[in-house]
């Protein structure tokens, strides 16, 4: 906990400031490298001007024409996407030897299809701009990789989860419904949108599959294993009904995914059916709470819900006497019906709170205190020149999002930013739509015109109907929905860059991007789960139940909703044809180890009277180490039959 307190307490803002400053410097270098295109954004659509000839002095038009033609070939039919992928892979495999070319830079200029689909051309930056400074190139790409992980988590913690919390209150959703719908979406947003970006944005479905499944193996093995070791000497019991229910649904979802992977193709109906598994799970959890609420009337004993709906999630005979949280659903009183309360604020960003600037700066009252104890309720950010300087370093990473994501949070309210965000958000949407390869210059002009008109209108209305000292009290739903939608847009943009950068590292090191997704991307997106769940466990009491429930319900949500929505969007883009899933034999091994970890927990915990033990923890960690060793050995060719 000392390390967590050091990094995320309000007394140590220097670390974040220096980190943001370094990331901003790297971002400036990327923009400078892309300066020619930024000076004339219409170059990205220049292929329509030259009719596909692709002959300009700068060479950028030729780059776009080749990339566009490749995508046209891909969209001609679903049966061609695998052949195109394999042909481009064979073509780009000669990057390191660059036979017939002076160096890798000349190879990339002649074969621009090898560059990943991102806003920045990382391969050209590394091999051309950093041609004589490879160490500097490695360092800058590495820093930017960490920055993208941070931006993904920070967007979830400080923007997306806040919108979900407000939306839940405005819609008056019961805590049970919010706990199985909006809450896991907030905590699992980085995994979900990274998967969607891999399927749709960069057409690297194998990266999305390996990222989600690799993260699931990590959380259900390493995180559960460490949690078990932390409480092995304590008298802690896990609710058996809740545990069996979660693992049963998770195993069923993995079997369903296995069938889909074996078929190798997916339609819109199949993708919807896969996502519907989570809908059924959420319905059962909500129904359990309703039955529990009326247990005396129906004489039934309901299952424990995923999240603590009462002061304690344990059975009455087990657990702490003092509840950790205020009850979310109060029992009936003589004065009237039960009073509905909302979920505690800390729950909405529990798995991504380590990325939050908001939690590091804002003090909270005792009733809203997160159980991991990262915040001192009397702590305040020191107003010093050093703090102000580090705040300036954060501007390049924070200002673009604040200028385009509407926010109505009391602590961070600014009328200037509010007016700017509703004015610039339509322009950002138009820019993203215009960046597609099949959009004409005329369509781009029309999109920008309407975006400016809509943005100006919204900005004028926001200016006239808001106050400088507090957020708007009326018409909150449009504000919250705007923040929700623009957070998703930023998720997609950041996740798309993250996947493109991982593909770049795969090209540079000669490593299959699937391995990087299985390890680097999975570990990066799972750091929040690791830190928050261990902190909850060390807090004791109900925290152990919440941590273990999250270790299974979270990966299940990412698998069903993250991969399900990714396959749905992919199938929708190929409709009425079927979407061909990537042929990756290693996915079956990943599923096998994931099922092995779940079965191990399902066998050991009941035999030990539902008490986490060292046997459970050591066994799960050993399973993960064997899994990683096996996958890396396959990738390096040490196990030919499994490659």
UniProtKB/Swiss-Prot annotation:
Name of the gene encoding the protein in the UniProt record: CCX3
A biological process term (GO) from this entry: response to cation stress
Tissue expr: Expressed in roots, leaves, stems and flowers.
Main location per the UniProt record: membrane
Places the protein is found: Vacuole membrane; Endosome membrane
GO cellular component terms, semicolon-separated: cytoplasmic vesicle membrane; endomembrane system; endosome membrane; vacuolar membrane; vacuole
GO molecular function, one term: monoatomic cation transmembrane transporter activity
Induction: Up-regulated by exogenous Na(+), K(+) and Mn(2+).
Transmembrane intervals: 18-38, 133-153, 180-200, 212-232, 243-263, 270-290, 413-433, 443-463, 475-495, 498-518, 552-572, 586-606, 619-639
Gene3D superfamilies: NCX, central ion-binding region (1.20.1420.30)
Name recorded for this polypeptide: Cation/calcium exchanger 3
InterPro entries named in the record: CaCA_antiporter (IPR051359), NaCa_Exmemb (IPR004837), NCX_ion-bd_dom_sf (IPR044880)
Membrane topology summary: Multi-pass membrane protein
Keyword Secreted included in the entry's annotation: no
Functional summary from the UniProt entry: Endomembrane-localized H(+)-dependent K(+) and Na(+) transporter. May have a function associated with the pollen vacuole during tube elongation and polarized top growth.
Family: Belongs to the Ca(2+):cation antiporter (CaCA) (TC 2.A.19) family. Cation/calcium exchanger (CCX) subfamily.
This protein's UniProt keywords: Antiport, Endosome, Ion transport, Membrane, Potassium, Potassium transport, Sodium, Sodium transport, Transmembrane, Transmembrane helix, Transport, Vacuole
Result of knocking out the encoding gene: No visible phenotype.
